[in-house]
Amino acid sequence: MHYAYFYLMSIIKRRYFIRESERKDLFKKFAEKLGVNPEKLFGVKPKIEVIFINKGKIFVINGRPVLMDLEGNLIPTLVFEEIIQKLPKVIVDMGAIPHICNGADIMAPGIVRIGGEFKEGDLALILDEKHGKAIAVARALLSSENIRALKRGKVFENLHYVGDLAWRVIKEETRGK
């Protein structure tokens, strides 16, 4: 076994497959929050495993870690391509990336371009300027219209980013698949 496995054992608190009633509640919340019919994506009766970590829960649906519940907020993981591609895009300059990947919130000066419209509290996908790769999922603290006008200050709360605890668990879950 390699080191990462033992490290992850300390992060993962417990894991189990959820019941039908829990699945219905999760799918209802999923449809409300993300505006997509989950049964079309996953089927009528998918296998859903919940992994409890320090910050919240990761939902592994049909073997793919696609959703997270962080402090009551349901968000897609960075590997859930079907959903994150529908989120508004925010392109940040290369100087902001190390800070974002260390958990920093997104500041107005680091934003190069905003693609799409959103309101305060909506989720957005943070992309790097050079490669266009997804590096974070963040919650808007202001509307897209207001953010475009700002030159300074915090504009997004970083919820899930490349390198966080959830990301490490997700990478280990998808390794070899």
Regions picked out by a protein language model, each given a short descriptive name:
Residues 6-56, 61-113, 117-120, 124-177:
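Beta-strand/loop-dominated core regions that host nucleotide or nucleotide-derived cofactor-binding catalytic loops
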